[in-house]
């Protein structure tokens, strides 16, 4: 574990103006790394994110015989035979949900014994529904606790057929099955059950990346896809900036009435979290009810921004936030109440933020327990732009997805004190 250092964000008294380039998308980078590792040949991934989550994915690929070179700070060059070797050790993936779920399904396509494991936080994050789905497909796989570690005995390829999985649970399970399906023994149909598809936009990201690497995917209605067993071919692939990271900068601009140039328009993003830009643009008149089901990683940003809104905001469709890097609903509620008692309340799996614009310009003594969750650390820094006395615990946890976050704020004139 990282030592529990503390960082204090000092309020700003002027609009934030400048240019900041967000890092590459974590979601797309880890999809591209996986697909490049499954492809035959050499792929060049540009605009990529270099962070804790992408590091563990690239290191796992290296352990299985894939060559992953890093010629600069935003490029991966991946050379693979398309066949992975079982390593002598467990694949340790930290707290990277994308790497853990994507690799768990992909490993069923190869011969050998594999163990997928993570840190103490990842060992609390569910993977049972994906394991159950793979078991129904005939894969010899187990995760006794319903969370990592996961043991997989690969037999050289997923069986052809049809698999159903509840689309409400996690889009990462769906994406994992889709990406693995192209390397199986025959066509695989992945069908979603449940009343809604959670974070459908991330499934669309997966399908676009698969097709860029040569997969043949046919939509069957609105909630099923047939993936042909074509495998993948190497390609050059450019990764757009991270929309979740952009939300902090959009919110900082809104809070300070500034002008921060990200080098890319909000409507140019393909990631679902970019939907948050429209809500941020409505500040301080954000809607009374916000459905977060399709932009879950943006909810921490919006929740802190809502504290300064002109009316209370209820966040719905966010139950999956309870099984992210931490229970983000509780972490957000606790952090907001550390700033002002009663500022937020949990109601079932909804979060209600009782807006109080008068908080701006006040002084508190709020120690924010981030639970080593990068998004909790980054979103509460926004509160520090308007309120004196916001202290962020374990600030270096931002390295999971945005290692340069504190430097980015400093470049805009924000004083951060350790």
UniProtKB/Swiss-Prot annotation:
Signal peptide: none annotated. This is 3-phosphoshikimate 1-carboxyvinyltransferase. Catalyzes the transfer of the enolpyruvyl moiety of phosphoenolpyruvate (PEP) to the 5-hydroxyl of shikimate-3-phosphate (S3P) to produce enolpyruvyl shikimate-3-phosphate and inorganic phosphate. The active site is at 297 (proton acceptor). HAMAP family: EPSP_synth (MF_00210). GO terms for biological process: amino acid biosynthetic process; aromatic amino acid family biosynthetic process; chorismate biosynthetic process. It is found in: Cytoplasm. Its EC number is 2.5.1.19. 3-phosphoshikimate binds at residues 26-27, 31, 170-172, 297, 320, 324. Monomer. It is an enzyme of class 2 (transferase). The gene is aroA. It comes from Pseudomonas syringae pv. tomato (strain ATCC BAA-871 / DC3000). Phosphoenolpyruvate binds at residues 26, 97, 125, 172, 328, 375, 400. Pathway: Metabolic intermediate biosynthesis; chorismate biosynthesis; chorismate from D-erythrose 4-phosphate and phosphoenolpyruvate: step 6/7. Transmembrane segments: none annotated.
């Amino acid at each position: 574990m990282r030592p529990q250092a503390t960082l204090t964000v000092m309020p700003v008294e002027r609009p934030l103006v400048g240019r900041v380039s967000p890092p590459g998308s974590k979601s797309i980078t880890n999809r591209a790394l996986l697909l490049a590792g499954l492809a035959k040949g050499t792929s060049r991934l540009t605009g990529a994110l270099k962070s804790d989550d992408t590091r563990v994915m690239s290191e796992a690929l290296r352990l299985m015989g894939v060559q992953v070179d890093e010629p600069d700070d935003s490029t991966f060059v991946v050379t693979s035979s398309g066949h992975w070797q079982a390593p002598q050790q467990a694949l340790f993936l930290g707290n990277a949900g994308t790497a853990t779920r994507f690799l768990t399904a992909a490993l069923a396509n190869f011969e050998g014994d594999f163990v997928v494991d993570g840190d103490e936080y990842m060992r609390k994050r569910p993977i049972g529904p994906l394991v159950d789905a793979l078991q129904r497909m005939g894969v010899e796989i187990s995760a006794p606790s319903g969370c990592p570690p996961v043991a997989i005995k690969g037999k050289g390829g997923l069986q052809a057929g049809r698999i159903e999985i509840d689309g409400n649970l996690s889009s990462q399970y769906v994406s994992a099955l889709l990406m693995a399906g192209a390397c199986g023994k025959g066509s695989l149909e992945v069908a979603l059950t449940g009343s809604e598809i959670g974070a459908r936009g991330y499934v669309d990201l997966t399908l676009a990346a698969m097709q860029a690497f040569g997969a043949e995917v046919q939509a069957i209605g609105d909630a099923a896809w047939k993936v042909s067993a074509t495998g993948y071919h190497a390609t050059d692939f450019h990764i757009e900036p991270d929309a979740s990271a952009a939300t902090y900068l959009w919110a900082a601009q809104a809070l300070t009435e500034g002008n921060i140039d990200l080098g890319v328009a909000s409507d140019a993003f393909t990631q679902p979290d970019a939907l948050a830009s429209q809500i941020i643009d409505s500040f301080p008149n954000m809607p009374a009810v916000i459905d977060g089901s399709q932009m879950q990683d943006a909810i921490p940003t919006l929740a802190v921004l809502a504290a300064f809104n002109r009316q209370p905001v209820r966040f719905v469709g966010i139950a999956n936030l309870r099984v992210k890097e931490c229970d983000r609903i509780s972490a957000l509620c606790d952090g907001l109440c550390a700033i002002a008692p009663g500022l937020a309340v949990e109601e079932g799996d909804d979060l209600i933020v009782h807006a109080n614009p008068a908080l701006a310009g006040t002084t508190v003594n709020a120690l924010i327990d981030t639970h080593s969750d990068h998004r909790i650390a980054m979103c509460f820094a926004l509160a520090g732009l308007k309120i004196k006395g916001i202290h962020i615990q374990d600030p270096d946890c931002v390295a999971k997805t945005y290692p340069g976050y504190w430097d980015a704020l400093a470049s805009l004139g924000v004083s951060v004190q350790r």
